[in-house]
């Protein structure tokens, strides 16, 4: 059910860090309520890319995405960038009105840069603000390192796992760092 207070969490996996030369290979979304309770998980989409594009990945991405099985899923996928964008928007329309939720995640500006370059309709679905968990991580590192260090990440660098971890990390900071 649509609620303007719901939050849209997104994570992208890419072939590299430059939105002008690299592309999105996986995306996932989760919608939470304003108290960070998961309401729904959106489609987890491996986006087809050619062998030529995949061969252009640097060593880290080749090793990481090859080891997680993502590279093979991308090769086998028949979903285009446009189809992935349309599926994701269709999911989000069920939960959050356009322009209401900030884009939520970890180091979310990087994801937003790729969305702006490759999926403009999806990027424009979000409010212009960002809810970036990495901001709290940076503040905790400076003001309360024990709080930052008490959250252990075990990222697989798969989009859905990364979102779940970002939500858990924000819940951790809400409980141990943000006083209200």
From Swiss-Prot:
The keyword Nuclease applies. Residues 7-170 form the Exonuclease domain. Its main location: cytoplasm. It holds the Pfam family RNase_T. One of its GO terms (biological process) is DNA metabolic process. It is found in: Cytoplasm. The keyword Nuclease applies. 3'-to-5' exoribonuclease specific for small oligoribonucleotides. HAMAP family: Oligoribonuclease (MF_00045). PANTHER family: OLIGORIBONUCLEASE, MITOCHONDRIAL. This is Oligoribonuclease. It comes from Pseudomonas fluorescens (strain ATCC BAA-477 / NRRL B-23932 / Pf-5). The gene is orn.
